[in-house]
């Protein structure tokens, strides 16, 4: 891509199939293609790790000419050493988000089982993966080394696991890389087809490419060649005609030019030899970035003719020198070197190459080196103590209150030229979800105490009680000029454990340990507050209604029911101040596995719980403890009369700044609607309700509010309704509509009496038909006249749009509605208004008269108990959230294939890697039928860790397929959430460890972060940023 005249480079990525017109949920992975609309390829990869946000295309390779016999013989030997690497980074760490991907590597020690690949493949954080050899044998791999700076890492495999081919290794010959040398890049295209691309080395002295905000290599030269390597080629060997590896594929141009960049193998060869000898791979640093600059630029920086002549005489082929680009504050060179210094000598040795500089620094850790530089034509000699590069590269992280933290890395510090210290938020989730940004925050202080490093942060967090609200001070690494201050709610009940993870290079795993139990929450105390007074508002009723509003914040620790967010805030209306009852939109409180906090008078914060959720009409009733609120809260008076079209009313709402706004207006329309279904993944939506619209622009700006009369009586609630996700922008649509209060009264009156209604509903969705349509469909003139008399304002009947999938208790011979039926009467009453359908709420069977295919038919329609439709259990397995199909699924599907429904999945998990997608149904495990969650848990509990198993699944559109998956209990242990009213949170958590049940497992132990979970197929943006 050409950006203002500049070209950009990128790491190679697998091509992604074009999105299909049909919703992605209707598709299943095939054998070798990506699933359209999803980031999960069919073969179990998600996106190539070299992906980046630039949309520039790699130049397609034309038909290759036949290679010479020498090259053919070489390639035949080389391909046996090349492997396809499939891997996950199981959680976000440093510059990388959690992900599943693939790349290439090659065997460099067949006896010990070492594979060389890129550092961005080996990952800075927790790695889990396997490799596939040329003969399609597979074995597990784990990292033994990842370089802190340079783009290479070493994986280890068990050579004895390869039984059907003789292992061969490639010799590393970095000295064989020369300008004009003919090369072949031998890699894997999406892990399926061997890709052999030819090229010629054109440069040996290119500076390392910049990859934007992600991981970047530096302090090394790169080799440039014309090859245009394809997706999945990251980590491929660059070989010469002798069959020796002379470089490592790393990156390329994103503007379509057939140019690639390779890492020289000098430092990988040294690291491999150290590992073979069992020695540590020492890495030294003075925390300075150097770049190569040609002599003409060096002269402008002050290089004298005498020194230029000396350099050219000592190295006749050199055309550039090393120049200081970035000196990190508080580093060994801070105050000694300056940007623009031209490096002349190190320890008295004339030096112009990165390789020799690395040699000296890596062998001088803990020692002092002398550097001679030229600064503005003057010789300057300094001494710097060489630090340990591994010491400023994080190898541990801590999770607490839903967030993940580690010390700021040298990578990030170099990128933004800041000191390599501080607490870095690599996964901003849970209590630490700051400003809706996933990562990049530096925490300066918590609870007014400084947190200069991870150890200080841990000690502070150990002392903070559950449910405490503390002040934190933070900055974003991209904007260090702005210091933010926020109050965070510390969640140590859904996330009770503070866990430390430490990298273990012997096993390749990250070892977890618990640091501290949570400090119990403090007992809440009553607090006083006064409501604001509205100045300049002429209606007294508006001034009073302010005392009936509270702010509602809902946080979900786990994604269920297809709901797309982990936190939602809005406003609710107090309907009984004495009992603490509040009605709020169900788009704000979608299910009861959540934390609800209510703010009264912008001052008092109290906890609330879910009392009732309406299955169709988009409202939830919650309850707080009124004894904790010493404020003049007023119960809103709800109208018993339905508001009418054209009637004047007062609109009172809250805008996006949570400020109250008022407008006198009129009702423009009252229409029977159903909120559109979300095509990509079913989720709760309101159906069969009369929606009110008003004649004011404020109605579209306000998510919550009320319509009130001059007497202060609430005529309608103003609610936000969650709608569909747009296919192009992938944003969720919200509708803002009024809901008449008389429809609330039957439910609220019972709750005020201490009775929780257990509603029953007809399992169908309807829409309005006018009399012209009804007559054509067979409704008689007699009934048309009756409709006109029964409802003079709206001559309408209701037609069945969709019949929900019937529950298991329905018998096959029971009467049922069908799509296209027109409902005339229920229990003898003509149905012309939505409110007249409410009679179904308390009836097990309804006598119905319908018109079907032009004939009037009498039916005995059974109703469905709504408590069976709400989610009361969830199983988290291999990163997938499994639950019984919720109501929205039943509304949109005609047949339930099982009661094991995939609701969401975590990025970087086995479910993500192997393509088990949301909206799939699991019907069998290893050939054993699993019709429900009990049978599923029983079968998967018998599967050993790190073992493959088969899942038979069915897509939402009834297409069966089989997925093979490998179990991972270390990073993704199975856990379960079960609704339990006896528990303080209303839910209990259970762990399943080798047939043992253990209460108290938490999302922390199950490696869950709802913000890193997908509830739908979607096109995920590339993890790698643009490259300049």
From Swiss-Prot:
Residue ranges, compositional bias (Basic and acidic residues): 991-1001
Organism superkingdom: Eukaryota
EC annotation from Swiss-Prot or TrEMBL: 3.4.21.-
Sequence segments annotated as region (Disordered): 1-46, 991-1028
Region (Serine protease): 82-266
Keyword vocabulary terms for this entry: Apoptosis, Hydrolase, Nucleus, Protease, Repeat, Serine protease
Top-level class of the enzyme under EC nomenclature: hydrolase
Gene3D superfamilies (alphabetical): 2.30.42.10, 2.40.10.120
Active site residues according to the UniProt entry: 120 (charge relay system), 151 (charge relay system), 233 (charge relay system)
Name of the protein: Pro-apoptotic serine protease nma111
Gene behind the chain: nma111
